[in-house]
Amino acid sequence: MQTSPLPRRTKIVATIGPATQSKEVLRQLIQAGATTFRLNFSHGDHAYHQQSIRLIRQIAFELNQPVGILQDLQGPKIRVGKFLNDAGSVQLKNGDPYTLTSRPVECTETISSISYEYLADEVPSGARILLDDGKLEMLVEEVDTVARDLHCRVIVGGTLSSNKGVNFPGVCLSVKAMTDKDKEDLMFGLDQGVDWVALSFVRNPQDIDEIKGLIAAAGKSVPVIAKIEKHEAIKDMQAVLEKCDGVMVARGDLGVELPAEDVPILQKKLIATANRLGIPVITATQMLDSMVNSPRPTRAEVSDVANAILDGTDAVMLSNETAIGKFPVEAVAIMAKIAERIEQEDINPSQAEASRTSIPNAISSAVSQIAETLNAAAIMSLTKTGSTARHVSKFRPKTPILAVTPHVDVSRQLQLVWGVKPLLVLDLPSTSQTFQAAINVAQENHFLRDGDLVVMTAGTLQGVAGSTDLIKVEVVKAILGRGVGIGQGAVSGRARVASRPQAIAQFTQGEILVVPSTNADCVDMMRRAAGIITEEESLTSHAAIIGLRLGVPVIVGFKGATQKIRDGAIVTIDAQKGLIYSGALPPVSKG
């Protein structure tokens, strides 16, 4: 059996919109490499988003693949009013006087209303105002607190259209991070079972506390992503990131709030901080923007995606490219291709400075080093909350991470975490049983094959986040069958198979006896056997009793053993687990 190459490590977030509403296009996006879908709640009503969620869940089920859903809340976006002329816009020239007011007025060539009540109280004279993502700029020359007006001068003119966004760089506004609409949208998203919630325009840790409090009050535990797009959040970066469960480098508004030339440096700092904290980070906005209208990206866009991956981002995001673009599937496919090529290079950012002071961090760091030293085929992480897998991912191991979880929501959330391939496996009574079931699932999906070495990690307090404290190394073996084990330990040897014991002409010391049942004539062979396998399943059978007396591992009740095991084949029996594998135990190094 050949192993299939494990998926690329960098995850891809695709935004849903008019271009990607059909079932067939969504299917193609997943097949092209999208691992999480973003629902932009700045657009569309609840019925629209509900339909998107249902389609995503249906297609993910059909493809037997976990797919995450990220709810992106609109936030308190401040906008100009609506121009009632035929064009729905006005032309502003450099040097023109213009008034912005919080009063409800008819918007014209000289005045526009602004959707912020405390405009004249908080925006001072001399402040810069940017409109339409920075395309237009004004300077506040006079503040009239009585009339609630800002008298401005146009610095950079252009077309100002209805409902365009307004930014106040360097001005601290008291606007709350969550509007009433955001709260309604959040409750809807939680009810629909979204996997992540992104909070827009985060300013401080208290904004994260507020949304987490609402989620907890609703009886949910959905993780929160902080969208960093305000200068206040940059000043309080460490504290904000310590509170949230993930972070988005929202380069659009960030590049308006701060000088555009600062954004690349801030991107690197945000990614590095998120990596150290072990939370997923998404790099977003205009990554392949030319693909809205073109089937191929520019060279600069390819470099932008590549450099975000080299910086250490967990995921790269497509916005307009998949929401309204002409080539949504091609955009995802090209982004996946870029990621796969970059990941071939051994230039992942070093995590040597990442904190190892906690037990989970120390274990996860050791797992990564052990896997690399032993050239393991995979790291298998047993996790109920996703914490163990995230801890391992934090150290950016070269070895693929298979995250074993019984929870569908956790498997979908991990589709945003670098290097992690979720495997859904039932919650079995013991860690060893769960690991064995996971190996079987991985083999069925061709992620592992016989003889592969796997480094396993888990927490002995299962279901408790941050309790990772176990490392185990195993060799993958094909399971031939199972029965009831008697005795202790695991042994390997050459199988001596016969339909009746008397048919075995010669039995050599250390071989494994495989027969339907044993009797008194078999005792001499049983003394020389390394192990015994019988089809008879009684715990009071001759094989069970004599094997126990002789201290020889026995497995009884393996139906069809004499047909399924080939005479002369090397097999391993594990009496503790009741399993029979093909192949031998790995050699034990000495010295």
From Swiss-Prot:
Q: Which InterPro entries match?
A: PEP-util_enz_mobile_dom, Phosphohistidine_dom_sf, Pyr_Knase, Pyrv/PenolPyrv_kinase-like_dom, Pyrv_kinase-like_dom_sf, Pyrv_Knase-like_insert_dom_sf, Pyrv_Knase_AS, Pyrv_Knase_brl
Keywords, alphabetical: ATP-binding, Glycolysis, Kinase, Magnesium, Metal-binding, Nucleotide-binding, Potassium, Pyruvate, Transferase
Q: Name one GO molecular function term.
A: kinase activity
Instruction: Please provide an example of a Pfam family that matches this protein in its UniProt record.
Output: PEP-utilizers
Q: Where does substrate bind?
A: 38, 252-253, 285
A biological process (GO) annotation for this entry? glycolytic process
User: So where does Mg(2+) get bound?
Assistant: 229, 253
Pathway involvement of the protein, from the record: Carbohydrate degradation; glycolysis; pyruvate from D-glyceraldehyde 3-phosphate: step 5/5
Domain of life according to the entry: Bacteria
Please verify whether the record's keywords include Nucleotide-binding. Answer: yes
Name the PANTHER family on file.
PYRUVATE KINASE (PTHR11817)
Question: Belongs to which family?
Answer: Belongs to the pyruvate kinase family. In the C-terminal section; belongs to the PEP-utilizing enzyme family.
Q: What is this protein called?
A: Pyruvate kinase 2
Q: Gene of origin? A: pyk2
